[in-house]
Design a protein with these regions (language model features):
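Non-transmembrane, aqueous-exposed alpha-helical and coiled segments at domain scale
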Residues: 1-388
């Protein structure tokens, strides 16, 4: 019987989904297809090998660390520039990552990234917490048909046609979008657009991406070849695009397990499915927005250091909070109830990471033994390195 594990962050992202994906793949001990189901390369899922190697996965599934094949499904946003950078990093670590890309994937280009960063800069103190990868701007560009060429569409263009497409985005779409927003580019941005180097590099990056991956049209045919499917969602339930309570401090994609469940439901036969909800033993949030349990890091552990979520111009410094068991449980139960409308027999599990930083317990008033009640199983992790 085919098996599937859906990896879901239970809060604001950065819960440990990279470790969870590798752990799930190792447990299955079979050939895995690791599906990137939402968002884009703004995700940052960290994996640490027992031999000391370390990588933050953006454009590849985290389970590719142990040989799984990655799959960018139809709602994932592909970025040729960031793909090329990451593939080179993985090859330096001794990996030869393989990847399938849906012909329906949207493709993010440097002008989308530029727009997102200009807009976020103009918000000043009211910034939303963009990662600077152009995810929202790519989604918005694809609402307008002249600019909405999918991965499959772009593969049918020759080099001259692809270059012309990029030139039109740079000379027509980009200034038009800024004009509608009442914004302008500073001299540095203008120089980057007018130099022509961005277009030349975009063509090279696109050709590299196109030659490095395998495109698929039919999800059922692709998935039939794999006994294990690991769906790796980006971000977390509290950042879901439909979470109106925290608007606009959200990610522009659906972060729930329903997206993966629908893909599983399309497949013939039965798929034994588990949702693995991931949480740290405390909470974090990178970027602005509501954070009810926020506290100084020192209240949790003054000595802990997050090597992945370093301060940056887009999201500033990582924020810390006590473990809010009531809020985490509410998000999980709501997500699970919706997914069981699609897959009634789905099992629910929880993985708690970073326990080494909180003395093996949850940071706050919630008792660990109380929180894990009601789940089909619980995985406790007190070290960042995946098990051998």
């Amino acid at each position: 019987m085919r098996q599937a594990v859906i990896i879901i962050g239970s809060s604001y992202g950065d819960e440990g989904k990279g470790l969870a994906s590798v752990t799930a793949a190792k447990e299955k001990n079979a050939a895995c297809l690791n599906i990137l189901i939402n968002g884009g390369a703004q995700r940052g899922h960290t994996v640490e090998w027992p031999d000391g190697r370390r990588h933050v996965f953006h454009h590849f599934g985290s389970a590719s660390a142990i040989g799984a094949v990655s799959c960018a499904d139809q709602d994932y946003i592909v970025n040729p520039l960031l793909f090329r950078q990451e593939k080179a990093e993985l090859e330096e670590l001794g990996l030869r990552p393989e990847m399938y890309v849906s012909s329906r994937c949207r493709v993010s280009l440097p002008w989308d990234m530029m727009l997102g960063q200009i807009i976020e800069e103009n918000r000043g103190a009211a910034r939303h917490g963009s990662c600077g990868c152009g995810i929202q701007e790519t989604r918005l560009r694809f609402l307008h048909s002249p600019w909405a060429l999918s991965f499959g569409d772009l593969t049918r263009l020759n080099k001259q046609e692809f270059t012309a497409y990029c030139e039109r985005i740079a000379r027509e779409y980009l200034p038009g979008r800024l004009r509608r927003l009442g914004m302008t580019m500073d001299q540095d941005w203008k120089a980057a657009v007018e130099s022509g180097e961005m277009i030349r590099r975009s063509l090279n990056d696109w050709e590299y991406l196109k030659e490095s991956v395998r495109m698929y049209d039919d999800w059922k045919t692709l998935s039939a070849a794999w006994p294990v499917l690991i769906f790796e969602a980006g971000q977390g339930l509290a950042l879901d695009a439909e979470n109106r309570e925290d608007y606009p401090y959200l990610t522009p994609s659906r972060t729930t397990s329903q997206e993966s469940a629908r893909r599983i439901a399309e497949l013939p036969g039965k798929t034994e499915t588990e949702i693995l909800y991931v949480t740290r033993s405390y909470l974090t949030r990178h970027g602005p927005g509501p954070f009810p349990s926020e506290c100084p890091k020192e209240k949790i552990n003054p000595d802990m250091i997050d090597r992945t979520n370093v301060p940056n111009p887009h999201q500033q410094a990582l924020r810390y909070g006590l473990f809010d068991g009531k809020a985490v449980r509410r998000r999980i139960l709501l997500d699970l109830s919706e997914t069981r409308k699609i897959l009634p027999e789905v099992r629910s599990s929880v993985m708690i990471t970073h326990l080494n930083e909180t003395g093996g317990k949850l940071a706050g008033d919630e008792k660990l033994e109380n929180f894990i009640q009601g789940f089909d199983r619980c995985i406790l992790s007190d070290r960042p390195v995946f098990p051998e």
